[in-house]
Each structure stands twice: as C-alpha cells, then as structure tokens.
C-alpha cells in the first residue's frame, strides 16, 4: 500500500503548541484517503517550535495530491494550534510543500493547497476552483468592513482585539496593551511620580529636565540643547518625524501679508522677498487643517488651546532652512500679528513653540494615524477579503499587513476612543482628532502615497537646490528597491498586461480599496482597476512602502524629536498671543503642558518609538509562502539592494551630529505593528 511521510511544523510563538487530536486527510486526483490520526506513542506531539514526522499509509494510489485537510479535535481542554507548514513525501520520492502559517482554533479544520502561487486562470480543476471560492467566501464573512467614524476610511468590524479573526491577532495581547505599555514606559523613564500632577506647572525650561532621560550623543539630547535655535527648528521640517509638510512657496498667500521690509534682515542674497520666491528660496508650512478644530475639553480644570499657524521659511546661503515669519492663525489682522526673528526673544520663541505644537498634532493624527495606520488597514482588509492564500499577491503582501489590523483595533479600543489615552495629554483629544481626520481624508490621494510624486508635488525634488533633505534621498532609494522587487514578482506571474486586466481577484482587491477605503471618491485618484504590469507594480509598491518605510519614517523618531516637551508640546494651556512685546518666560512655561500631561506624552512617544521583540525588518520573509525558485531569487536580490542602501546611509551618517537613520532598511519594520 502507498505510504507518505508527513512532516508537520508547529509555530515557535507563545502558546503555539497543542495537546488536541490532529487528523490528516489527503485529497488527490485519483481519490481521497481516510482520516489519519497523527500521533506517536509515548511522544508529546505538536509542541511549540517542533517539527514532527509521521508515516501515513493509504489503501490505494491517490494520484497527484491536490489538497491536505487538517482537523483538530478536543483532547482535554481546547488550545489553539499554530501550524506553520506541512511537507509531504510521496511514494515516488517527490516532496510537496503546503504552507499554512495560520491558527487552527476550537474543533476547527483547515484545507491547504501546495505552495505554488496560482492565478485563478491557472486553476482548471473543479476541486481547486471550489477550494479557492470557498476560502474567499469564508474570509468575506470574517473580514467585514465597518465605519468607525463618519468620513473615515472603513476599518475592520471588531469592537475589541479578541473579536478579530485569530490569524490576525497579536500572539500575546498583553504586549500591545497601550495602558500597560505607557505605564511601563513612565516607570522605565522614572517619571511615574509626576504622572498624576495635572494642573501643576513646571518652574522653567530647566525644570523639564526632571523627566528627561539624559543619554549622551543622541538626537534627543541634541534637541534639548539646541531646540530654541532657528537652524534646529528649520531642520525638523526636512528630517524630523514629520518631514512631509514643507513645500516650496511659488506665490505668497494673501492670508500671510508679509513684506520684504519685515523680513529683510533674514534675507541674505540682496533680493526682495518676491524675488527670493521666484528664485525658489522660500518655503512654506501651512497648518490650515487645524483652523476651527475643537480643542480638548475633557478636563474642566484645564483649558487647552489650538492654533492654525502659517510658517514661512528661507533657504540661506549655507543651503539651510530657517524660519523668517510666523502667523499663528489663518486670518490676518491686528490681533494676529506676524512674528519675526527680529522680535523680542520670547515673542519669537513662543511663536515657534506654537508651530511645533501644531506640527505635533498634524503629525500624530494625519501623517501617522491616517496616512500609514488607517491606509494600511484598508489594504490589509481588502487583501484578506479578495485574494486567496494561493494568489501570488497575497503571498507577497501578507507580511506587510502583519498585525496592522490588530494594532489599529487596540488603538480604537484604548487610545483614540472616547475618553481614551489620547484624551489625557493632547489638545486635539476629546474629538478634535476625529474632526482632523474627517477633513484630511479629502486630501488623501493615491498620488500623495506615491513617494516620488509626493516629493515632486511639494517642489522638494531637487537634490541640488535642497541638499540636506535626507528623508527624500533615503526614501527614494527604498522606493526604487521596493518597486524593482515588485516588478520582478509581477513579471513572474503576469506575462503581459492582458493577464493583469483579466485577473478578477486582483481587480476585486483594488475595487475594495477604492470603494470601502476611499469611500468611492473619484477625486482620491485611487484606481478602480489596474490594466498593466507597470501600474500593478506601482500599486504594490505603494502598499509595501506605506506599511514599511513611510511608517518607519514618521513613527520611530517620535522619542528623538518629541521627548523634550518644549520642542513638541502636545497641548497648550493659554491661547496664542495677540500682540507683540508682552510674552515673558513665565508665560511660556505656564502655556506649556503641566507635569502630568508632560509625563503621559513622554510615556507615549517612548512606547511608540520601540521596536517589537523579534521585529521583522524590510526584506525579511521568514514565513515561506512562496516556494518557487524565481521568486526566492528575487527576494535575495531585494535584500542585497536593501543592504547596499544600509551601507550608503551608514557612510553618509558617519561623524554627523544629527544622523538620519529612520529610512535605513535595517530599521524599517515590514508592517505597521506599533
């Protein structure tokens, strides 16, 4: 009788093993086997991290093996089991790999196909077509769209983490508990003694050092020492944790009535302000999005305030960006003066602090939450709903949506919900952050997620004119490496554009993103369909780059740039000044966050800036969903390209007082998971 050797690999994460009964059935072209119990006498099967082998003898020849069915039945108490893969050695000596990388829960079962990636058109056998269809039908029942707030991109239909499908939950929910992590962070930073001191002001700037962790030769220490300087202020628009707002100014906006006379002390080329604009030396950052947003009113004992500043910047003769004019609200007038570097020291400093605070709000809610977290969740849900596990694009993308839906669900449960942690320390808490997302969705376009196009649209693409924009330089290198990789994968499975156009599962995936993620907005520019290999490669690059590089660039620098509270105040306790010459140091300190809010803020930026244990960085694919040699070779080339970029960035950063490393591939996690 024919005999098969079955190798079963159990996951190595916590609680991956099982004591339940595991049964296996083989389904082939010539028939199906009986159900076989996988069990070895006096042996503890399916332990965490184990690879177990079993001999399975069948009554008759099964022909070509199409499917492997695994069933789990209760032994004593139910325990979930994480199955990595099954390898089958046939009676003819052939080896067939069946990737799984999924949890089997309860009295569950799972049916696996071999690891060869297949488009729907490649499946001509009825049982394989049926398996493909049933998998998507089941997934679409599990992964349902839900509107969390009106106008938001749709998210997963789950009220809390435990409501999620087991396959996309965190291995241990405890590790991503925001309340626990923030509390731990404050304990690790030795600031928990201050965390309940709301309404208690700091005495002066030096007093903030009581909660500042001094680590020499770090960016955070340099920020603390130089945050008041115009050069440091300007540098952050290029290479801080929100390097996506600065634009080249092509015409001075009427709402900012600044004149040459006002700023002539800052201009170094003997040109008028209008001439400097024409020469491309003037830049602008406009926080119009914050105009009219409701400030946090959740604490009746503390009034909190927002501004909507406009900041004009200048490229000096050293090619450095420095501020030359700041207006703290959108409507010009006597009570909304334009602050200048020539004003009194504290007038100018407070104006810059207001800009930094506004930048923090836009960064957290729009640059970070909306444009990486929520967008990546949309891609993830659409992928699970429309691409079966055998589809090459599922195999390509699954590593880049790992834990994204889970972290967003935890955020909605604990962080950005009503009375959540976000409300504790942020002036946009209490609903302002929701209003901001609802506004910003209108500007969420496909082209703004295409990195080279986004840089060009802001007039920031010239390396000659703007030489110290490392976010742009490194981002382009990583974008090109990802695009080269996706084009290789696309070319392996789609021999021409027609195959792309006729792949209905791909088209359904793209349509799901457009209809539910972008809410069917034509102005978003998101494609409803994809008709060429080139456009498909670009689309996949957007998905991967957003989840990996873009998130890394705007997330992991938060402690570096925001831990010194005066450089990134999460709230302000007095309104913006309406006149010049009245600001004092005492007024500035009383405007900055109190001790309690400072500590909650510090705990947040520390926790959000930490890599996960066993982090998977860009190019690392330990789950072998692909088994074909051409794709594995493409992955090797991808990793080599990324290693070369790591070397380029390391060489540039040598001896730099302010190194830029957020887009070094060895520091870019594969997915949004924190």
From Swiss-Prot:
Q: Which reaction does it catalyse?
A: (5Z,8Z,11Z,14Z)-eicosatetraenoate + O2 = (5S)-hydroperoxy-(6E,8Z,11Z,14Z)-eicosatetraenoate; (5Z,8Z,11Z,14Z)-eicosatetraenoate + O2 = leukotriene A4 + H2O; (5Z,8Z,11Z,14Z)-eicosatetraenoate + O2 = (8S)-hydroperoxy-(5Z,9E,11Z,14Z)-eicosatetraenoate; (5Z,8Z,11Z,14Z)-eicosatetraenoate + O2 = (12S)-hydroperoxy-(5Z,8Z,10E,14Z)-eicosatetraenoate
By its UniProt entry, which Gene3D superfamilies does this protein fall under?
3.10.450.60, Lipoxygenase-1, Domain 5 (1.20.245.10), PLAT/LH2 domain (2.60.60.20)
Alphabetical list of SMART domains matching this protein: LH2
Disrupted gene: phenotype observed:
Homozygous mice for ALOX5 are also present in the expected ratios. Mice are indistinguishable in growth and size from wild type littermates. Homozygous mice for ALOX5 show no apparent abnormalities up to ten months of age under normal physiological conditions, except that the spleen is usually smaller for 8-week-old mice.
Listed binding positions for Ca(2+) 2 are: 18-19, 44-45, 47
InterPro entries found in the cross-reference section: LipOase (IPR000907), LipOase_C (IPR013819), LipOase_C_sf (IPR036226), LipOase_CS (IPR020834), LipOase_Fe_BS (IPR020833), LipOase_mml (IPR001885), PLAT/LH2_dom (IPR001024), PLAT/LH2_dom_sf (IPR036392)
Q: A single GO BP annotation from the record?
A: humoral immune response
Where is this chain's protein located in or outside the cell?
A: Cytoplasm; Nucleus matrix; Nucleus membrane; Cytoplasm, Perinuclear region
Site note Essential for stabilizing binding to COTL1, residues: 103
Q: Please give the CDD domains that the UniProt record associates with this protein.
A: PLAT_LOX
Q: Which residues carry this modification: Phosphoserine?
A: 272, 524
Q: How is it modified after translation?
A: Serine phosphorylation by MAPKAPK2 is stimulated by arachidonic acid. Phosphorylation on Ser-524 by PKA has an inhibitory effect. Phosphorylation on Ser-272 prevents export from the nucleus. Phosphorylation at Ser-524 is stimulated by 8-bromo-3',5'-cyclic AMP or prostaglandin E2.
**Name used for this protein in its record:** Polyunsaturated fatty acid 5-lipoxygenase
Altering residue 360 to W: what's the impact? Increases formation of (8S)-hydroperoxyicosatetraenoic acid ((8S)-HPETE). Exhibits a (8S)-lipoxygenase activity. Exhibits a (15S)-lipoxygenase activity. Loss of arachidonate (5S)-lipoxygenase activity
Q: What does the record say about its membrane topology?
A: Peripheral membrane protein
Q: Which cofactor does it need?
A: Fe cation
Tissue localization of expression: Expressed in skin Langerhans cells and their emigrated counterparts in draining lymph nodes. Highly expressed in circulating leukocytes.
Cellular component (GO) terms are:
cytoplasm; cytosol; nuclear envelope lumen; nuclear matrix; nuclear membrane; nucleoplasm; nucleus; perinuclear region of cytoplasm
Major location (coarse): cytoplasm
Keyword Cytoplasm listed = yes
Q: Which domain of life is it from?
A: Eukaryota
Residues recorded as binding Fe cation, renumbered to this chain, are 368, 373, 551, 555, 674
List, alphabetically, the SUPFAM superfamilies matched: Lipase/lipooxygenase domain (PLAT/LH2 domain), Lipoxigenase
Q: Where does Ca(2+) 1 bind?
A: 17, 79-80
Q: Which family does it belong to?
A: Belongs to the lipoxygenase family.
Other comments?
Can be converted from pro-inflammatory 5-lipoxygenase to anti-inflammatory 15-lipoxygenase by reducing the volume of the substrate-binding pocket.
């Amino acid at each position: 009788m024919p005999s098969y050797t079955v190798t079963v690999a159990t996951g190595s994460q916590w609680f991956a093993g099982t004591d339940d009964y595991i049964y296996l059935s083989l389904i082939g072209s010539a028939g199906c086997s009986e159900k076989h119990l996988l069990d070895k006498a006096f042996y503890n099967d399916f332990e965490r991290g184990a690879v177990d082998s079993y001999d399975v003898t069948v009554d008759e020849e099964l022909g070509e093996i199409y499917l492997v069915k695994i069933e789990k039945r209760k032994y004593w108490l139910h325990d979930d089991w994480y199955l990595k893969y099954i390898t089958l050695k046939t009676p003819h000596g052939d080896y067939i790999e069946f990737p799984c990388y999924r949890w089997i829960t309860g009295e569950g079962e799972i049916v696996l196909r071999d690891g060869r990636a297949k488009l729907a058109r490649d499946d001509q056998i009825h049982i394989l077509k049926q398996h493909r269809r049933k998998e998507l039908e089941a997934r679409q029942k599990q992964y349902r769209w839900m509107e969390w707030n009106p106008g938001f991109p749709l998210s997963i239909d789950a009220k809390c983490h435990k409501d999620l499908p087991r396959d996309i939950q965190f291995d241990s929910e405890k590790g991503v508990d925001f309340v626990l992590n923030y509390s731990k962070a404050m304990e690790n930073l030795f600031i928990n003694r201050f965390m309940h001191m709301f309404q208690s002001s700091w005495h002066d700037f030096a007093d903030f050092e009581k909660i500042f962790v001094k680590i020499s030769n770090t960016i955070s220490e340099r920020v603390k020492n130089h945050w008041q300087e115009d050069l440091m202020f300007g540098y952050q628009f290029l290479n801080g944790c929100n390097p996506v707002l600065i634009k080249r100014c092509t015409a001075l906006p009427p709402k900012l009535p600044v004149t040459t006379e006002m700023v002539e002390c800052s201009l170094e080329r003997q040109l008028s302000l209008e001439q400097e604009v024409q020469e491309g030396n003037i830049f602008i950052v406009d926080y119009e999005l914050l105009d009219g947003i409701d400030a946090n009113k959740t604490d009746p004992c503390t009034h909190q305030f927002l501004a909507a500043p406009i900041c004009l910047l200048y490229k000096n003769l050293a090619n450095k960006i420095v501020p030359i004019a700041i207006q703290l609200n959108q409507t010009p007038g006597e009570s909304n003066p334009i602050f200048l570097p020539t004003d009194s020291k504290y007038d100018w400093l407070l104006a810059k602090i207001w800009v930094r605070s506004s930048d923090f709000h836009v960064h957290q809610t729009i640059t970070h939450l909306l444009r990486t977290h929520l967008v990546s969740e949309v891609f993830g849900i659409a992928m699970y709903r429309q691409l079966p596990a055998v589809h090459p694009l599922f195999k390509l993308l699954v590593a880049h949506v790992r834990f994204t839906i889970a972290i967003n669900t935890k955020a909605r449960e604990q962080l950005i919900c009503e009375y959540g942690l976000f409300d504790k320390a942020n002036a946009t808490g209490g609903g302002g952050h929701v209003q901001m997302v609802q506004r910003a969705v209108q500007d969420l376009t496909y082209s703004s997620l295409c990195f080279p196009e986004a840089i060009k649209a802001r007039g920031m693409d010239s390396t000659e004119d703007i030489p110290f924009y490392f976010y742009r330089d490194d981002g382009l290198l990583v974008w090109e490496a990802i695009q080269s990789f996706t084009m290789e994968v696309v070319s392996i499975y789609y021999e021409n554009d027609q195959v792309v156009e006729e792949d209905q599962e791909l088209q359904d995936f793209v349509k799901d993103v457009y209809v539910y993620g972008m809410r069917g907005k034509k102005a978003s520019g998101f494609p409803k369909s994809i008709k060429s290999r080139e456009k498909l490669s670009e689309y996949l690059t957007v998905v991967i780059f957003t989840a990996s590089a873009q998130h890394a660039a705007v997330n992991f620098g938060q402690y570096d740039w925001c831990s010194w509270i005066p450089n990134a105040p999460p709230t302000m306790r007095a309104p913006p000044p309406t006149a010049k010459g009245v600001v004092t140091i005492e007024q500035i300190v009383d405007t900055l966050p109190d001790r309690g809010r400072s500590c909650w803020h510090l705990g947040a930026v520390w926790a959000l800036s930490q890599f996960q244990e066993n982090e998977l960085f860009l190019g690392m694919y330990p789950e072998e969903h692909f088994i074909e040699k051409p794709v594995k070779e493409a992955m090797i080339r991808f990793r080599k390209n990324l290693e070369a970029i790591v070397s380029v960035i390391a060489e540039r950063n040598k001896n730099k007082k302010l190194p830029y490393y957020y887009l070094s591939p060895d520091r870019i996690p594969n997915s949004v998971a924190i």
